[in-house]
Amino acid sequence: MRQKAVFVLVRTAVLAALALAFQSLGLHQYITGPVINAILYVAALFISPWSGVAVGIITPWAAFLVGIMKFAPVIPVIIAGNVSLALISGYVGRYQKHLGLGLAAVVKFLVMTGGIKYLIMTGTKVPAPVYAAMTLTQLFTALIGAVVALAVLEGLKTFDAKRRHEST
């Protein structure tokens, strides 16, 4: 049991490091967003939904700390979106992968849009570019990330099957 926990922790740490490294490149949101979402999907489906949650909590804080995300009030909104994406894709995706990823993308968009609207309702001055980046753009980047994740997961499945076959 303990060995499995270490295995999960190491895989989660590797995906978190990959996400942080990619974020640090400072690429446009339409490139970074799909990659980070793909990593969240892969963590949730290949390791566990809670692995995806861990990566989804770490990445917005890291983006803020290194200056990629400059508007702190949206950090909880991003975390809520990432957590919803990881949990839905991880649990629904076990039974119906395409439905799980698509539903997760839509729910992430709805959660983040609702979160931004809540910030505005409570008096937070959300700059227009931040509003745009945290609403409809999230749907697009999550859907593109789902397509990337499906390809990665298929590759991991093939690699894992070969590895298991060779170890027998």
Which ranges hold each PLM region?
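Loop-helix junctions at membrane interfaces
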Residues: 1-168
